[in-house]
């Protein structure tokens, strides 16, 4: 399988449990009564193992190409999505054990179809019941709609009509309130159930951001955009507050998502019109100084400077975010989460580029949770440094695997397709590709964070090699590597060739006498 590199990371976990195929959702789940008064708890900043049991209703192996559940995760330590997988057993159950770092967003993927997001907490056990045909129906309807180009009838320099600027609430358009495809038990079940049934598919809140992005850059709306956007925010919050379907925890969660989207709208508006953050606004004139102070006051009044925003992580970690928030809040005013996540983003990048951190820099992190994460990355980097590869790779492989047939997998931890194929291949090493002459080599570079790379090295059998950028670039050129994963085959005579993802060539070469 060839796939352009995308920003997903993947890890694998499989446990087989005996039982029977579920024909329907258990009655105890269907009859569960939500606690309508329970508030949204503070987000968890801790590391613990989370267990997710995915039950496919009316399961048959013929329902999937790969009988694997992909669980896409973004926790409080990762700047890209992680992906854990579980094999679906004969009973339609996939058991996935996750070393979770803080509260996480999750979605289920089966083949090329995926679910809406739900929440996982470290230490919880969550059961997810899936109506796979219904999930595919909704997912494909969603993807078809995303491919449609919406024409709002006005450009950046046009004067839009009142009708064109009319905002409307995005609702769940796929009938999930009466025909859901996910049911939850354990963990954040109430909140997950509400978001799945009543929130827009794969969105955090009811903003129409396609229209919003068009409005904020229109030059004729510049003077009124912020006021109109804030009116919209207030309207949405009122609608949420009076929605009797929602328990208190969901009202607080969705209301926070609206506030965060208002914050991001204002940030994007300032960035577009003033080419940067609030500090970019020229305050030399009295009018501009007042305007700058007004924007700062609005941002402070949104109430988003809180650790609760960890529930709805988007782009809180970036150089721009760090500069933006420093222009609105003093360092002492920033909530612990915002303070530490921007530092972690910077520190992690430096560690991955072989830079050293001082003890003073480590002490700047307020939360033990993030100090522990950073220390794990430092420890992993030290292991990698002691094993840095500096040889002639192809010649070394010829000598080390003389007379062997070697499958060389070029991959990285940001490639979803790479990891899916690694997971698929692992059990085949004991069946289809079981041969005394078979060998497996996995090659990556600095794109793969060291701590994640070490996790894969422990789990995926074979030799794992980490190259520097120059070495990787030379091999990319030699073998015309443009997509990942790419498979290079070394035959018994020591010749190397790109097999263009055709793993059958590896099997044919093994079977040669």
Feature locations, PLM:
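Bacterial Sec-dependent N-terminal signal peptides
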Residues: 1-24, 513
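Thiol/disulfide oxidoreductase modules built on the thioredoxin-like
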Residues: 470-511
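Alpha/beta-hydrolase fold active-site loops
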Residues: 405-406, 485
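Thiol-based oxidoreductase modules, predominantly thioredoxin-like and allied folds used
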Residues: 435-452, 459-471
């Amino acid at each position: 399988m060839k796939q352009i590199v995308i920003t997903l990371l993947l890890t694998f976990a499989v446990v087989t449990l005996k039982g029977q195929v579920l024909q329907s959702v258990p009655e105890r789940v269907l009859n569960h009564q939500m606690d309508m008064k329970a508030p949204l708890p503070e987000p968890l900043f801790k590391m613990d193992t989370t267990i997710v049991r995915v039950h496919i209703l009316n399961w048959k192996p013929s329902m999937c190409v790969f009988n694997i559940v992909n669980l896409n995760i973004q926790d409080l330590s990762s700047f890209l999505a992680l992906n854990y997988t579980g094999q679906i057993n004969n009973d339609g159950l996939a058991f996935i054990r996750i070393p979770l770092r803080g509260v996480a967003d999750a979605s289920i993927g089966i083949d090329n179809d995926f679910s809406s997001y739900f929440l996982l907490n470290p230490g919880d056990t969550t059961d997810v019941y899936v109506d796979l045909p219904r999930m595919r129906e909704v997912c494909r309807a969603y993807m078809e709609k995303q491919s449609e180009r919406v024409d709002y009838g006005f450009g950046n320099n046009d004067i839009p009509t009142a009708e064109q600027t009319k905002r409307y609430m995005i609702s769940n358009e796929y009938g999930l309130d009466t025909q859901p495809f996910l049911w939850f038990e354990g963990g954040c079940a109430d909140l997950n159930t509400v978001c799945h049934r009543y929130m827009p598919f794969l969105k955090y809140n009811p903003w129409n951001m396609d229209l919003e992005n068009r409005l904020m850059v229109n030059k004729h709306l510049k003077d009124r955009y912020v006021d109109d956007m804030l009116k919209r925010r207030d309207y949405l919050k009122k609608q949420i507050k009076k929605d009797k379907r929602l328990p208190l925890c969901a009202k607080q969660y969705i209301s926070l998502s609206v506030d965060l989207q208002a914050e991001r709208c204002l940030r994007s508006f300032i960035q577009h019109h003033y080419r940067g953050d609030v500090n970019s606004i020229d305050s030399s004139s009295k009018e501009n100084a007042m305007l700058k102070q007004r924007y700062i006051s609005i941002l402070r009044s949104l109430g988003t400077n809180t650790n609760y925003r960890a529930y709805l992580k988007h782009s809180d970690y970036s150089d721009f975010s760090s500069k933006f928030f420093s222009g609105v809040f003093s360092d002492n005013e920033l909530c612990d989460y915002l303070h530490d996540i921007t530092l972690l983003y910077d520190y992690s990048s430096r560690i991955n580029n072989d830079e050293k951190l001082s003890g003073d820099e480590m002490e700047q992190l307020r939360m033990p949770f993030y100090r522990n994460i950073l220390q794990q990355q430092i420890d992993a980097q030290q292991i990698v440094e002691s094993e840095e590869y500096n040889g002639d790779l192809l010649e070394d492989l010829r000598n080390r695997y003389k007379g062997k047939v070697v499958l060389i997998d070029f991959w990285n931890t940001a490639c979803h397709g790479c990891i899916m194929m690694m997971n698929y291949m692992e059990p085949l090493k004991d069946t289809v590709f079981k041969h005394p002459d078979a060998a497996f080599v996995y090659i990556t570079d600095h794109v793969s964070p060291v701590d994640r790379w070490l996790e894969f090295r422990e789990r995926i059998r074979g030799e794992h090699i980490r190259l520097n950028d120059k070495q990787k670039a030379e091999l990319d050129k030699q073998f015309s590597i443009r997509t990942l994963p790419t498979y290079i085959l070394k035959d018994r005579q020591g010749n190397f060739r790109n097999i263009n993802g055709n793993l059958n060539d590896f099997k044919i070469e093994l079977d040669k006498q």
